[in-house]
Design a protein with these regions (language model features):
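Enzyme catalytic cores with a strong preference for nitrogen-chemistry domains
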Residues: 1-328, 344-345, 380
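ATP/NTP-dependent adenylation/nucleotidyl-transfer catalytic domains that generate, transfer
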Residues: 146, 212-213, 238, 262, ...
Length: 590
């Protein structure tokens, strides 16, 4: 039985368009002789659909989409489609996270999710009820009946601990051990995280060895709001060895054919099929027009991170209908990295940058911004804010009893720049990219309605030290191949030593440095990571050897900045815990 893994990039809520995308994949798979096509979790909706699942009109549209798909399916090929299965007569949550088998002429629900994640960015118990029994699909192919275990994403996560707690008490894999399976299938929508692709393979390998059957894993790919899905579907054999690897961060359609002799050892195997061996690492079907493969191999950590951010920006702009992007280019390292990511995601011809110098802007920063723009080939404009500063001072002096001073004057500069950027983005119909990093968002070293302005915080989940490391890698020779693949200049330095080595500064007053207000980032970031991602208490950090006064200061800044983060644009999630939908702390709290 030949299987096809359809790694798809869905638009959330576009049931008609997603259905057409599934159908196109099925037609290509049928041409390759596939009996069954696998699509990701909730593939008809796109993941996560959130409160769209509560709209009755969309549940009705789902039925029409499934019927349309069944009417157009090629004969002899079925597809497993992720969908929401209504529970008749039930109060909310009144749905199952489910899988439908769609074949020519009809469809039926064949599997339901058992483990519903309700942590971090996941909130499935708001919408779904867990299934109580395992799901097994019997499917005929080439004169043989195959028993396929069906699991959905979290159902596989029963062997590892993540974020300091076990993900589930139940064990769907154990409940499948008595089912005499031939294959285990997993339909997933698992977001990107550093090292997560390898973790998924370890989980699948463990399930394979427990059940004694191959595991076929298909994952969603693409960016949906702040979440980035890296794809990287795969097949492991009954011993847990990798036999097929799908593309990383791109749509893909791959075929794999298990040996007829695979499956439970006590199952009868037709003699004529016993010698039919599974191709090890079956070739990927050439991508359809518009489907580009970055790499079939899992990239190294810096490249993973860069490509995840590029994919997130590209899909956010495309799915929100923006034709281009705008950012402020200060000559600092944060905006430089965002400019690189934007050019890789959209093409330099669709990215525009503005320098907005004040009397405190250094000549070096202006030159560095111009040099970077020239290397990237993006359009750079200049809008000095000194005249606007004078006008604001004149307008505010009567109300304040004197000219604005201190933080008020500094924040005015940031807000003037934010206003200019929003005006240009509004006029040109461009996506304004916020350039702040996670360290700044954590401690509130940013200005509401100023440098926080934007539709997407590209590096809002990268600590400042991570920004430095990624930029250092981008300027190193080992990044050349990745840069070339992303359409960036591959020769020489990209960010530039002048930008990488200058002391961080907002340049809002003479000789200002970030270190005037904050600890060095090499000291600050480990404390922030412990407080934010590990949810450690200040007492735990002090007990581990951290300076008590410093920890208390950082914890206080983190707590007091909550009101700013609540008004920040969505930040692409690439860490274990990002500010956004997975960070739910009160503003008014002790």
């Amino acid at each position: 039985m030949r299987l096809a893994l359809a790694q798809l990039d869905a638009l959330v809520g576009d049931l008609v368009g997603n259905g057409e995308r599934i159908l196109n994949a099925c037609r290509r798979a049928a041409e390759a002789g596939a009996r069954l096509v696998l699509t990701p979790e909730l593939s008809l909706w796109g993941y996560p659909p959130r409160d769209l699942l509560l709209r009755p009109s969309l549940l009705e549209a789902q039925t029409r989409a499934l019927e349309s798909l069944a009417a157009a399916m090629p004969a002899g090929t079925g597809v497993l489609v992720g969908m929401a299965d209504p529970i008749p007569g039930s109060e909310r949550p009144a749905l199952h996270n489910a899988v439908a088998l769609v074949e020519a002429g009809g469809w039926r629900v064949v599997g339901r999710k058992r483990l519903l994640p309700s942590y971090d960015v996941f909130d499935e118990r708001r919408y779904f009820r867990p299934a109580e029994a395992p799901s097994v699909l019997e499917l005929g192919s080439d004169g043989r009946s195959w028993r396929l275990g069906l699991t959905i994403c979290e159902d596989l996560w029963v062997e590892e601990e993540l974020q300091g707690h076990r993900l589930a008490g139940a064990d769907p894999i154990a409940d499948l051990q008595a089912q005499r399976l031939d294959l285990l299938l997993n339909l997933s929508a698992s977001p990107f995280g550093q090292g997560k692709a390898a973790l998924r393979r370890r989980l699948a390998a463990r399930a394979a060895t427990r059940l004694g059957v191959p595991v076929v894993y298909v994952n969603q790919v693409g960016g949906n709001d702040e979440l980035v899905f890296d794809g990287a579907g795969f097949v492991v054999d009954a011993a847990g060895a990798l036999v097929l690897q799908q593309a990383w961060s791109a749509e893909d359609l791959s075929v794999w054919e298990p040996a007829a002799s695979q499956g439970s050892a006590d199952r009868p195997v037709p003699a004529e099929s016993a010698a039919k061996l599974a191709p090890q690492g079956s070739p990927t079907i050439p991508p359809a027009p518009g489907w580009s493969l970055f790499s079939l191999a899992e990239p190294e950590a810096p490249e993973q991170l860069l490509r995840a951010l590029v994919l997130g920006v590209r899909d956010y702009a495309r799915k929100c209908g923006f034709g281009g992007a705008l950012l402020g280019l200060s000559g600092g390292i944060d905006s430089a990295l965002v400019a690189v990511i934007a050019c890789a995601a959209l093409g330099a011809e669709r990215v525009r940058a503005l320098r907005m110098p004040s009397p405190w802007s250094s000549e070096g920063s202006l030159t560095d911004a111009a040099d970077l723009a020239a290397r990237l080939g993006l359009a750079l404009g200049t809008l000095p804010i000194a005249p606007l500063m004078e006008a604001m001072e004149g307008a505010l002096t009567p109300a304040l009893g004197g000219p604005p001073a201190g933080l008020t004057a500094e924040n005015l500069q940031s807000r003037l720049r934010g206003t200019l950027l929003m005006a240009v983005a509004n006029q040109e119909g461009q996506l304004l990219l916020s350039t702040g990093n996670k360290s700044e968002l954590a401690v509130g070293y940013c200005t509401l309605y100023g440098d926080m302005n934007g539709g997407l915080a590209v590096i809002g989940d990268l600590y400042k030290t991570t920004v430095f490391r990624l930029c250092t890698w981008l300027d190193a020779p080992e990044s050349a191949a990745c840069r070339a693949a992303l359409g960036l200049p591959a020769a020489g330095e990209l960010i530039g030593a002048a930008i990488r080595t200058k002391p961080p500064s907002a340049e809002l007053r003479p000789d200002q440095r970030d270190s005037d207000s904050l600890p060095d980032y090499a000291v600050l970031d480990p404390i922030l990571k412990a407080l934010v991602e590990e949810l450690a208490s200040p007492e735990q950090l002090v007990a581990a050897g951290a300076d008590a006064a410093l920890v208390e200061r950082v914890a206080t800044l983190l707590r007091r900045a909550e009101f700013k983060r609540r008004q920040a644009p969505p930040a692409l999630k690439v860490s274990g815990r990002a500010f956004g939908s997975g960070w739910r702390f009160p503003i008014a709290a002790g």
